[in-house]
Structures are given as structure tokens and as C-alpha cells.
């Protein structure tokens, strides 16, 4: 679950990087919330989109490892990988689905900027070809 301040930070990052996609990771508490929802997000860690593209994102593997190390040192877990879709709605593309295969159990948070004045943020669990939207 993402609180309003982290949600605002996520949207700000997407707007700052436009027209290119933004990307990063979210740290979460190591256990599910009391109400059975997704674990509570406690931190946002921006990453560099090495593709520098409005159509896709790439994060250098060494940067991913540094981010995960920092998250775990703080006593948290990797909960989500986030990025933006600068021209479309926040629904996983085939590229997202393919990439998610390497990160089972990690949520995919997508900021849709098809209308930059009214961004949409959605989160998904992607398992193989199955896409399940989860509550933010």
C-alpha cells in the first residue's frame, strides 16, 4: 500500500522524467499489513533509465543490486518496481510482462501519463501471462 506522500513523489518523478519513462523501486515493510493488503510501502528509490526512452525503461543491474542492498540494510524488502508510461494508460505492456518474469512476487507499479494533468497509478502482480491488479 502506498500512502499519499509516496504517491505524490512517484507522480513527481514520472513528470520530471517525461517524455522518457521514469523507473525505480519501492521498499516495503517485511510483512503484510494487518488487513491482508499488500505490505506498506516505506520508501521510494529512484533509478536511472539507461534506455532514456519514452517507450521503455532499463535499470543497470549494478544499480538494482545497490538499491536492494540499501533497502535491506534499512530492514525492509523490495516490494515493487515502478515506472511510467508516458503516452498510455498504466497497464503492463508485453515488455513489462516479459521483464516481470525475472521478479516473481514483486509488484509492478505503473504511472500513466496519457493525461499529464490527471495521472493514473496502478499496481499489478504479474505471474507468467497472468496479470492481477492489486490495491495501491
Please provide the spans of the model-predicted regions:
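Conserved beta-strand-loop surface patch within small alpha/beta domains used
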Residues: 1-78, 87-136
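Metallo-beta-lactamase
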Residues: 84
